[in-house]
């Protein structure tokens, strides 16, 4: 699991084979499903929370995007995407938070 953020980052720069990215994306999506993230978020449309593609677009080009999205996942908050607060996710391990944040910032790819 520790290679997922690295693999996604390399994929964004064009340095990783598609099959490795597909495996990492599938693992990240499974983690999102297991932790009920997909109850409030979808990849390309707003549900209760913002679409993952909108989150990726909002943070595109920001050097601290991974840290910001990771903090939002772990601590929750409100006001950034509307009035509905995102609950904190204190039970997620830091590595799981980074995996989810990297996947979201990559546009939550299936492959």
For the regions a protein language model found, what residue spans apply to each?
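Bacterial N-terminal signal peptides
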Residues: 7-15
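Short microdomains enriched in Cys/His and/or Lys/Arg
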Residues: 58-68
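Sec/Tat signal peptide C-region and signal peptidase I cleavage site
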Residues: 16-22
């Amino acid at each position: 699991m520790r290679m997922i953020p690295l693999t996604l980052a390399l994929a964004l720069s064009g340095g990783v084979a598609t099959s490795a990215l597909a495996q990492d994306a599938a693992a990240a999506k499974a983690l999102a499903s297991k932790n009920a993230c997909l109850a409030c978020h979808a990849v390309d449309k707003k549900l209760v929370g913002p679409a993952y593609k909108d989150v990726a677009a909002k943070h595109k080009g920001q050097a601290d995007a991974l840290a910001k999205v990771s903090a939002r996942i772990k601590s929750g908050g409100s006001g950034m995407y509307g009035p509905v607060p995102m609950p904190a996710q204190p039970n997620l391990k830091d590595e799981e938070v980074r995996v989810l944040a990297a996947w979201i910032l990559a546009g939550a790819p299936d492959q």
